[in-house]
């Protein structure tokens, strides 16, 4: 009797040391299938490897370019022009624009401005622009027709493929002698793709600030502008 009891005890111990063969019931199978489907939906099946980054990220994120600009990184010439009535005389505005040695004192982002040479109707200038420690220099030939025209064209080709700035002054409103009509235009194309993309982002704002800076300079030198009736004001802007 004791021997049979010992044999049954040993059999129970042995059966606990070996895996049992179990029959999977239909309910168990359904539960397992649900678990597998749930895991698959969550994308966390253990035996799956993570997909590469490009497959995980949305296409619109992967397609973004530098500064999130959707256009391709290609140089494009930018052009801007405007016509407006100013409350200063032709001579006053001509003197402000042609005084390039003073640009460093009032033109936004102009850190240094020098007249390299000068002769009748022309001068050669060198400007340093930018934000320290990133500064760029370029040289321009300036055509001067007093008091009608100041035209600056970049000549060194290191920073720009093309740069031309034109200020034209003509008589203003009849009956308002201290006014003039300004026709301003600028066109440029950077050599650097980075500069070109920055220009695309900030071009309009930079140009507006630049024109406003010349008006403030005229106000500082010659006092408040002539008061022009609102119905006679003219301001047209074109840019590409």
UniProtKB/Swiss-Prot annotation:
Q: What does this protein do?
A: Required for the function of coenzyme Q in the respiratory chain. May serve as a chaperone or may be involved in the transport of Q6 from its site of synthesis to the catalytic sites of the respiratory complexes.
Q: Which UniProt keywords apply?
A: Membrane, Mitochondrion, Mitochondrion inner membrane, Transit peptide
Subcellular location field: Mitochondrion inner membrane
Q: What is its main location?
A: mitochondrion
Q: How does it sit in the membrane?
A: Peripheral membrane protein
Q: Which family does it belong to?
A: Belongs to the COQ10 family.
> Domain of life of the organism in this record?
Eukaryota
Q: Which InterPro entries match?
A: COQ10-like, COQ10_START, START-like_dom_sf
- GO-annotated cellular components: mitochondrial inner membrane; mitochondrion
Q: Which gene encodes it?
A: Coq10b
* GO MF annotation terms: ubiquinone binding
Q: Does the keyword Endoplasmic reticulum apply?
A: no
Q: Which organism is it from?
A: Mus musculus
Can you state the subunit structure given in the record? Answer: Interacts with coenzyme Q.
What's the protein name? Coenzyme Q-binding protein COQ10 homolog B, mitochondrial
């Amino acid at each position: 009797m004791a021997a049979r009891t010992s044999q049954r005890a040993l059999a129970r111990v042995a059966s606990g040391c070996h895996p049992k063969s179990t029959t999977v019931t239909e309910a168990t199978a359904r539960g397992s299938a649900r678990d597998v489907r749930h895991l698959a939906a969550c994308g966390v099946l253990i035996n799956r490897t993570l997909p590469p980054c490009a497959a995980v990220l949305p296409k619109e994120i992967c397609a973004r370019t530098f500064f999130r600009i959707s256009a391709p990184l290609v140089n494009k010439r930018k052009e801007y022009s405007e016509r407006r009535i100013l409350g200063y005389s032709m001579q006053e505005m001509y003197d402000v624009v042609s005084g390039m040695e003073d640009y460093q004192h009032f033109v936004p982002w102009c850190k240094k401005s020098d007249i390299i040479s000068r002769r009748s109707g022309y001068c050669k200038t060198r400007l340093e622009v930018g934000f320290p420690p990133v500064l760029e220099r370029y040289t321009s030939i300036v055509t001067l027709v007093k008091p009608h025209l100041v035209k600056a064209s970049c000549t060194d080709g290191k920073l720009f493929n093309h740069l031309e700035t034109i200020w034209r002054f003509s008589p203003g409103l009849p009956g308002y002698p201290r006014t003039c009509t300004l026709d301003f235009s600028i066109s440029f194309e950077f050599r650097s793709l980075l500069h070109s993309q920055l220009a695309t982002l900030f071009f309009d704002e930079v140009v507006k600030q630049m024109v406003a800076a010349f008006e403030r300079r005229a106000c500082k030198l010659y006092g408040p502008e002539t008061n022009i009736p609102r119905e006679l004001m003219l301001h047209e802007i074109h840019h590409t």
